[in-house]
Amino acid sequence: MDRLELIRRNVQEIVTEEELEGLLKNKEAPRAYVGYEPSGKIHMGHVLTVNKLIDLQKAGFKITVLLADVHAYLNKKGTLEEVRKIADYNRRCFIALGLDEEQTDFVYGSDFQLGAEYMLNVLKLSRAVTLNRAKRSMDEVGRAMDDPTVSQMVYPLMQAIDIALLEVDVAVGGIDQRKIHMLARENLKSLGFETPICIHTPILLGLDGTKMASSKDNFISIDDTGEDIYRKFKKAFCKIGDVEENPILALFRYHIFPRYETVVIERPEKFGGDITYHSYAEMESNFIEEKVHPMDLKNAAAKYINEILDPVRKVLL
């Protein structure tokens, strides 16, 4: 797989591919970043962007991970001291998930976001962005509020300035970050900064085929036990022959096949014996043709996800 194929793998959108191709031609070691608001519950949605960072490292990129403690503070997730401790925990988890520590710069927001240069650029951007545009860039929870705080309006402006002052070529995030990334693309040039290329990953559904929600117990947290994962997978939505909005197949596509050259589905001989797959497309085709049973996929997915999460569990012990 060449550099461009690695970068394109499992992404929903690149803005723009032409700019990306030019970057790869002109810069030997470009820099990409993701910002993570420190979270006590890292789930497989977070891991999807970690997987993309690993792909980018293999493609020769230097990686910056912003541990956005100030953003978390503005979002009322705790005191700066509390969210800094969670950020330290997140850093250890991301390394355990496979990020190359030697090739990754971990930056805390509080290390640069409280300085005069940063705040001056946020103020400059605030003069250029309308209130309606800032509100459109807020996260879904903030947009749904009748009376959001000013800090929640400032949040997307800060994300744009993060991209500028971290001096990255590429901003990576879930497709839910698109509005913020487009705000950066539209405005940073006028402030004297480069326009970032943006790579967006899909948003994964919960195990029941609906939106992930902690109240539904329908997502995989990286601190779930092996027993938790087998229990959750057993009741996961995986309609036979149906590949649309199938969370089990999504785990194979986005998390398992990128980390394993071959995937083995273990089955008793009376049900046809083990099947070895060398690509996700091969597995999907067999599933559509009903040559492999949903429960066999669930058991295999649980086994591989547990293997992926084992290094993280050692960090947590």
Curated annotation (Swiss-Prot):
Q: Does the keyword DNA-binding apply?
A: no
Q: Which Pfam families match?
A: tRNA-synt_1b
Checking PROSITE patterns in the record gives: AA_TRNA_LIGASE_I
- What molecular function does GO assign, one term? tyrosine-tRNA ligase activity
* Chain location of the short sequence motif 'KMSKS' region per the record: 211-215
The GO cellular component terms are: cytoplasm
GO biological process terms on file: tyrosyl-tRNA aminoacylation
Q: Which reaction does it catalyse?
A: tRNA(Tyr) + L-tyrosine + ATP = L-tyrosyl-tRNA(Tyr) + AMP + diphosphate + H(+)
Q: Which UniProt keywords apply?
A: Aminoacyl-tRNA synthetase, ATP-binding, Cytoplasm, Ligase, Nucleotide-binding, Protein biosynthesis
Which intervals of this chain are the motif 'HIGH' region?
A: 38-46
Record keyword RNA-binding present: no
**Subcellular location as annotated:** Cytoplasm
Positions that bind L-tyrosine: 33, 155, 159, 162, 177
Q: Where does ATP bind?
A: 214
EC class of this enzyme? ligase
Q: What Enzyme Commission number(s) apply to this enzyme?
A: 6.1.1.1
Q: What SUPFAM superfamilies has UniProt attached to this entry?
A: Nucleotidylyl transferase
Tell me the protein family, please.
Belongs to the class-I aminoacyl-tRNA synthetase family. TyrS type 3 subfamily.
Q: How does it assemble?
A: Homodimer.
- Function comment: Catalyzes the attachment of tyrosine to tRNA(Tyr) in a two-step reaction: tyrosine is first activated by ATP to form Tyr-AMP and then transferred to the acceptor end of tRNA(Tyr).
Stated name of the protein: Tyrosine--tRNA ligase
Q: Which organism is it from?
A: Methanosarcina acetivorans (strain ATCC 35395 / DSM 2834 / JCM 12185 / C2A)
